Amino acid sequence: MKVNERGIFMKNHQININSQKCIGCQMCIKDCPAKNIELQQTKASIIDNECIMCGHCVAICPKNAVSISGYDEEPILKQSNYQLNPEDVLNTIRFRRTIRQFQKKDINQDILENILEAGRLTHTAKNAQDVTLIVLDKEKDKLEKMAVSLFKKIKPIDNLISSMAKRNEITDYFFFFEAPKVILVASKDHINAALAAQNMEFVAEAYGLGVLYSGFFTMAANHSRQIKKQLDLPKGQKLVTALVMGYPKVQYQRSAPREKSNIKYM
């Protein structure tokens, strides 16, 4: 395992440029955020291996002359231009609701893997690729039971300061609402984890699934030694969010009202 001075996980990757294929167009040189490529005798050449391995040089090369070692898969060629319909994307956000009522229907494994793929492909700061995804399936009820036990102990305190807490009973399904799957998202960087979670939700929505972000379970997991031990996260990582996921039992008829944004142009 190789880590540079900025702590970027590099895992023995190396950039290679095929001089036979390179046409010296300099597209990789202009696009490299690390300024790690130069032109030598009309061919692109790597200065050293200390970069974030973002792969922009691989993606932009018109002749497929650049590669990065150490990956299990080959880059996918973009066959044609595609564009999302802006109004469709906005409506997906507009009509998206947090789901707390789920059908008793499991999620197909192929669908689940595509959702997880969205998390894997999500961009991360400095290309850290430091997001851990945990799918709760067989252990879901066990972990929820641990979290319920913890919350039942602290509920009397919450009741003293919140009328809403008084109205909410801590049931056996208080956290996951009997949803078939839960995806836990952990990282050292909260933004990296949040971006992965959001992308996974978009793919889940495309498959007709509904999602709840369980802040309560996240809170319980980060305060429970038992749950931490069960999750066995990589050193330094923390659970950032939990995507409770399944097919909605209810259909919403319209958008919900929202306050105006606090937007400033400068």
Q: How would you name each of these model-derived features?
A:
Residues 2-266:
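Acidic, surface-exposed loops and disordered segments
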